[in-house]
């Protein structure tokens, strides 16, 4: 590398800008083609006389002999040599070369074909026949030689000779294409009986469904339907009635039915379809079912179409279940499908057995969920319930339905979770069988094994329907011993006692309830107060409100307390239907409650609750008060004022908010400025009344009329929420 001349290196390109004239690949190719020198052509030789011809032939033979001497196994060299001799009309020499080549490779199909082609070109027919005879004797499994031999004889109109060649060929039991060629030969010359005999020999050699169908189609096309039926019947007898054999012969059944359809024999076709489908499993007969469905839609009645659609849907569901056996939706669909089919057959007057439906249900419930989690079992347990309902309603097999319920109860892992719907369905089944004691035993076992609120509720509802109030009380005692925090259970118990007019027991139950740690204590207190108010016991209701206010001082409790004081309690109708006037309320007591509530909320600094209370108080005064009391409440209503405070995100920035300003708070905090503020506000209202512009820029109007409606709605909607401060 050190002695390399630097001048040999390629020059460095300094200007990388594109050239003004661009050269394309097309120009390069065109220029290369123009500059290409002409190829050397061999001189043409013209033979002038026989001497020169003999010299030329001798030279070419020498070349060919030299070539095959060095490449003796090259069939191409031998073929070229023989064909050149044939081109010189030296057929004897050409045959000699071909024979020498056959000595080298007698099994070369290409060599035999070119040898026969040479003889045929020279119109040496007998030589060609002899060659074909030698070839098929030596190579009987090469179809090309047979085809060429047959074609030669038929071309020469030697049909009998062609038939003899086919007969020799058929002795070797060739493939189906050879048999079909033989049959087509006979058809071309209208030898249909011979063709039918060939079909029979072909079937004996290769009895596959396709060949049977082809034979039957041939007989049908030549106007022999009875013969075609005989062919199909022979085929079906050959394949047999076993499942595997019928599956193999599906195409034969389908072709047989299609032929009968073409011949307008619809009942025959229907019988053929049903015969095959009855012996095949649903998963293996999808195509046959599809053809049967199409047949029924075209030529069947409504019942037949429904039956075929039923079978098609069966196959679809079976395929889904084969992929996922725990697909309970597919099991439900399949079970409903079988139930509908069973009911339809029974309505048609057929004597059907429910074995197919039971088989589906048994297979379905055998697929137990893999995990002990209730979310996996929810759909599964409905299979058992639907199974039991089918046995009870459709088959009237009550003992079997009871066994289904028992098996389901035994299967569920009750220590982990249970299903109240299962226990209740089992119990109501026993009720329908008029066995009340058995139903009680079932529900008792369920409560003893796995108590849950829904199970208690269902058992209590059953006893209520039976009017067994002592049992209902016992059940409620067990229910609340199991879970004393259920507010709804306490209320339901009091409703039961109210229905039997045992009011002292109702009060005792409520007293027990309010002493418990309830999940929703506000609804229990409200129910207790509503009960006393409904009985006209205002003093008892007042005591309950006082006890409730000791626990919570929510604004809704105060509002409800005040409205109770003004409401009319008691009343109703006596035994004769005469109306009884209730005890009227006292507006002064209601105002006292409002005042107490306002003071309590003011002491706690609850501005929003105070505003809600004042709005309710204002509505009360508008309905039950006079102008003086209403004006007093309106003077207590707050106004809105825009103020600023530090942001809660800790950034130190100020944020704007609207604050409620109560007159009594301002009066106590700034008595002097409050008087000035009142005078300024009165002056602003006076000017507004005269139609002049002006006002206080720092004090916005309170919009008390709009807030009236909003406050009332809020007050009513938050009534129960206020009692949740227990």
Swiss-Prot record:
It comes from the Eukaryota. Residues 682-726 are annotated as: Disordered. GO terms for cellular component: post-mRNA release spliceosomal complex; Prp19 complex; U2-type catalytic step 2 spliceosome. Residues 702-726 have a biased composition (Acidic residues). HAT repeats lie at residues 55-87, 89-121, 123-155, 157-188, 190-221, 223-262, 264-298, 308-340, 352-386, 396-432, 434-465, 467-499, 501-534, 536-567, 585-626, 635-667. InterPro entries: HAT, HAT_Syf1-like_N, HAT_Syf1_CNRKL1_C, Syf1-like, TPR-like_helical_dom_sf, TPR_rpt. Keywords: mRNA processing, mRNA splicing, Nucleus, Repeat, Spliceosome. It is found in: Nucleus. Pfam families: HAT_Syf1_CNRKL1_C, HAT_Syf1_CNRKL1_N. SMART domains: HAT. SUPFAM superfamilies: TPR-like. Involved in pre-mRNA splicing and cell cycle progression. Required for the spliceosome assembly and initiation of the DNA replication. Belongs to the crooked-neck family. Associated with the spliceosome. This is Pre-mRNA-splicing factor CLF1.
């Amino acid at each position: 590398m050190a002695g390399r001349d630097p001048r040999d290196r390629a020059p460095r390109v300094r200007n990388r800008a594109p050239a003004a004239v661009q050269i394309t690949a097309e120009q390069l190719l065109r220029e290369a083609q123009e500059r290409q020198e002409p190829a050397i052509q061999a001189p043409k030789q013209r033979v002038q006389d026989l001497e020169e011809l003999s010299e030329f032939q001798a030279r070419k033979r020498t070349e060919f002999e030299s070539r095959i001497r060095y490449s003796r196994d090259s069939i191409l060299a031998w073929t070229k040599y023989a064909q050149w001799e044939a081109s010189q009309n030296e057929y004897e020499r050409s045959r000699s070369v071909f024979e020498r080549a056959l000595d080298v490779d007698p099994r070369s199909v290409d060599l035999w074909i070119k040898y026969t082609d040479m003889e045929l070109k020279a119109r040496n027919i007998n030589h060609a026949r002899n060659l074909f005879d030698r070839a098929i004797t030596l190579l009987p499994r090469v179809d090309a030689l047979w085809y060429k031999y047959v074609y030669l004889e038929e071309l020469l109109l030697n049909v009998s000779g062609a038939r003899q060649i086919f007969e020799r060929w058929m002795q070797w039991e060739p493939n189906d294409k050879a048999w079909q060629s033989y049959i087509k030969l006979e058809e071309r010359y209208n030898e249909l009986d011979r063709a039918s005999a060939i079909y029979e020999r072909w079937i004996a050699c290769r009895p596959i469904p396709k060949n049977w169908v082809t034979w039957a189609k041939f007989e049908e096309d030549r106007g022999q339907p009875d013969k075609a039926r005989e062919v199909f019947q022979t085929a079906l007898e050959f394949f047999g009635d076993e499942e595997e054999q019928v599956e193999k012969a599906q195409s034969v059944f389908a072709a047989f039915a299609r032929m009968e359809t073409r011949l307008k024999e619809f009942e025959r076709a229907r019988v053929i379809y049903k015969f095959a489908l009855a012996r095949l499993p649903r998963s293996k007969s999808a195509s046959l079912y599809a053809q049967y469905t199409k047949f029924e839609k075209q030529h069947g009645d409504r019942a037949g179409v429904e039956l075929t659609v039923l079978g098609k849907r069966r196959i679809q569901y079976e395929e889904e279940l084969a992929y996922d056996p725990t697909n309970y939706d597919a099991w439900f669909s399949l079970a409903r499908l079988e139930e509908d089919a069973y009911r339809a057959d029974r309505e048609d007057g057929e004597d059907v057995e429910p074995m197919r439906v039971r088989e589906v249900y048994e297979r379905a419930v055998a697929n137990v969920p893999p995990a002990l989690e209730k979310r996996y079992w929810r759909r599964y347990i409905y299979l058992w319930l639907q199974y039991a309902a089918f046995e009870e309603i459709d088959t009237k097999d009550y003992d079997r339905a009871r066994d289904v319920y028992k098996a389901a109860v035994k299967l569920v892992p009750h220590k982990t979770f249970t299903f109240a719907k299962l226990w209740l369905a089992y119990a109501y089944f026993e009720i329908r069988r008029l066995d009340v004691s058995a139903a009680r035993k079932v529900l008792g076992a369920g409560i003893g094994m796995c108590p849950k609120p829904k199970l208690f509720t269902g058992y209590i509802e059953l006893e209520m329907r039976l009017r067994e109030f002592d049992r209902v009380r016992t059940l409620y005692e067990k229910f609340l011993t199991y879970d004393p925090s259920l507010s709804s259970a306490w209320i339901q118990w009091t409703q039961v006692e109210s229905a039997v007019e045992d009011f002292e027991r109702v009060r005792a139950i409520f007293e027990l309830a309010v002493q418990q740690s309830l999940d929703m204590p506000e609804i229990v207190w409200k129910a207790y107060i509503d009960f006393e108010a409904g009985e006209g016991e205002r003093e008892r209701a007042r005591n309950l409100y006082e006890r409730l206010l000791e626990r919570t001082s929510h604004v809704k409790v105060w509002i409800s307390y005040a409205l109770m004081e003004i409401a009319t309690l008691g009343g109703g109708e006596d035994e004769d239907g005469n109306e009884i006037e209730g005890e009227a309320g006292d507006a002064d007591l209601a105002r006292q409650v409002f005042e107490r509530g306002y003071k309590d909320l003011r002491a706690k600094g609850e501005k929003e609750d105070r505003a809600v209370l004042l709005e309710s108080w204002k509505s009360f005064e508008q309905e039950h008060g006079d102008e003086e009391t209403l004006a007093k409440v309106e003077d207590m209503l707050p106004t809105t004022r825009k103020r600023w405070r530090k942001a809660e995100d800790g950034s130190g920035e100020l944020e704007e908010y609207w604050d409620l300003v109560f007159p009594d708070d301002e009066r106590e905090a700034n008595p002097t400025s409050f008087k000035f503020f009142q005078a300024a506000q009165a002056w602003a209202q006076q000017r507004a009344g005269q139609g002049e512009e002006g006002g206080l820029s720092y004090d916005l109007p309170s919009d008390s009329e709009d807030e009236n409606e909003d406050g009332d709605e809020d007050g009513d909607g938050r009534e129960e929420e206020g009692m949740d401060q227990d």
